[in-house]
Regions:
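Charged, amphipathic alpha-helical coiled-coil/dimerization segments
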Residues: 23, 73-136, 140-143
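Pre-recognition alpha-helix immediately N-terminal to the DNA-recognition helix
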Residues: 14, 25, 41-44, 103, ...
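N-terminal leader segment of winged-helix/HTH proteins
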Residues: 1-33, 151
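Central "turn" residue of the DNA-binding helix-turn-helix
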Residues: 50-51, 62, 124
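Short, locally clustered residues in the helix-turn-helix/winged-helix DNA-binding domain
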Residues: 19, 44-48, 109, 136
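Key DNA-contact positions within bacterial/archaeal DNA-binding proteins
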Residues: 40, 66
Length: 151
């Protein structure tokens, strides 16, 4: 009889548990400023390039259109983004940051850095760099997105 796997001793198990813990921390931290954790990633994309099409945001974040639509509705409700139809394609919409959405960036960055510091407390600078590299490789494996050295 084959020996049963000890899930708790696998990298996948640890990664899943750390991801869950981080996600919960992200929700708490961003909730303090009225955001849900996933919405932050939409804002990150718009800070890189404002006026993206909704479908492009979904593609960049590897999320479904309904999921992005729900996130955008929440961001519109709290006046961080607006949605505009394209003149040349009535089926397509572009998403733009509002003034408030642009102004919130600094505050959100502060919250993010605090979250990151809490997450990495206890790791040396070298361990942080190694972790960053390894997570970049895992991201590349799952999404085809280049890792930190490939950008």
């Amino acid at each position: 009889m084959a020996e049963l796997i000890k899930f708790e001793e696998t990298v996948s198990y640890l990664l899943a548990r750390v991801t869950t813990a981080f996600r919960n921390s992200l929700e708490r931290q961003m909730g303090q400023i009225g955001l849900h954790g996933g919405q932050i990633f939409v804002l990150l994309e718009l800070w890189k390039q404002d006026g993206l099409r909704q479908i492009d945001i979904a593609g960049r974040l590897n999320l479904s259109a309904p999921t992005i639509n729900k996130m955008l509705k929440g961001l519109i409700e709290i006046n961080l983004v607006t949605r505009s139809r394209l003149d040349d394609d009535a089926r397509s919409t572009r998403i733009f940051l509002t003034e408030r959405g642009r102004e919130m960036r600094e505050h959100i960055e502060e919250q993010w850095l605090e979250l990151e510091e809490n997450c990495l407390t206890g790791l040396t600078e070298t361990e942080r760099l190694v972790l960053f590299e390894l997570l970049g490789k895992l991201r590349s494996t799952y999404t085809g997105t280049p890792g930190p050295d490939d950008d």
